[in-house]
Amino acid sequence: MSIIIKIHARQIFDSRGNPTIEVDVVTENGVLGRAAVPSGASTGEHEAMELRDGGKAYLGKGVLKAVENVNTIIASELLGTSVFEQNLIDKIMIDLDGTPNKSNLGANAILGVSLAAAKAAANELGLPLYRYIGGVSANTLPVPMMNIINGGSHSDAPIAFQEFMIIPVKAASFTQAMQMGTEIFHHLKKVLHDRGLSTAVGDEGGFAPNLAGGTEDALETIKKAVQSAGYTFGDDIMIALDCAASEFYVNGKYDYTKFEGTTGKIRTSEEQADYLAELASKYPIISIEDGMQEDDWAGWKYLTEKIGHKTQLVGDDLFVTNVTRLSRGISEGIANSILVKVNQIGTLTETIAAVNMAHNAGYTSVMSHRSGETEDHTIADLAVALNCGQIKTGSASRSDRMSKYNQLLRIEEELNDVAYFPGAKAFKK
């Protein structure tokens, strides 16, 4: 056994300049595992709770309480534990916290230790993280969903939907997918520049232009960039949307005026689903995330029955990487895919359980970053380890996003002939 002899947390900064937590786990052999924890801007009501300090420092967003919880309470319980006992490590922390949403010790504190322990274990064995977690069957490179236009809570653009993503489904490899995606990104910059629009980027590296025509203007602009790059819109490149509908759900209605002003419409649940179906019939949209509000189960059911047979419907705020909510969705036939965010649930063990439950039920899974990221690229390894087949980790800019893509390039190179890139096969038919 390789025993944990030291656990140390510190406060660092994420890509938005907000504090976050980083944890080191050290074994008796002097092997280090280090993990930094991400943070979201649009967070689901049912997510595990990250612990923030409050007060004036860092506008209340400090994480020194979470750091202290790791360095005192958690460390004292885990020192002497084998670093290979991942399930036990996570269970001890869950029991220590004692709340359903990890609000006592903080999901950020618990997750930092959970991921750092896994990294230390992998390093002890001299294995890459994806191989340690996924074993010999971990060989699927995820298809990237590249977020090239940002709206909603991720930018100041007057568009309700949070993300407009391109998917290089005709790529033969992850490397080629990156080439296609980055070329389109740079062509989009020129298209926007030629229209006199801003080419500043949002939290996830996508552009945040003031597109007066709203959603369809964004889609048409992407179409032009795809064609300008020499690719076929609707064949080489498909589209994914993250509506983040909970962000503009007001008094039981989908209120687009929150982000789009007087030009925005107010829709009922059925009207919202019908609108998404209309968009999916007009444009090559093969994936829609959070098209309905997180607790609008009836709306989700209607949407799933309407287009779930041909469109991937991803539950993010709906499922929050939580097996309890996912189990309900599966039993009621709601959505057909789960977004996977490690900090929504707070431990590696629970993340793996959610992905396994989804796959066993025939749901697809999409590994995902958060809008507040760091240079940590753990989710790249997790996407391969769990054979997710898809990943959301931002646009082709900002090193906090590119670090994940670069790690996947390394993994594909390492796997060589064993690497499998599913392309369009990764998506729900």
From Swiss-Prot:
SMART domains: Enolase_C, Enolase_N. Its cofactor is Mg(2+). Keywords: Cytoplasm, Glycolysis, Lyase, Magnesium, Metal-binding, Secreted. InterPro entries: Enolase (IPR000941), Enolase-like_C_sf (IPR036849), Enolase-like_N (IPR029017), Enolase_C (IPR020810), Enolase_CS (IPR020809), Enolase_N (IPR020811). The active site is at residues 204, 341. Pfam families: Enolase_C, Enolase_N. Mg(2+) binds at residues 242, 289, 316. GO terms for molecular function: magnesium ion binding; phosphopyruvate hydratase activity. It catalyses: (2R)-2-phosphoglycerate = phosphoenolpyruvate + H2O. Pathway: Carbohydrate degradation; glycolysis; pyruvate from D-glyceraldehyde 3-phosphate: step 4/5. Belongs to the enolase family. PANTHER family: ENOLASE. This is Enolase. It comes from Flavobacterium psychrophilum (strain ATCC 49511 / DSM 21280 / CIP 103535 / JIP02/86).
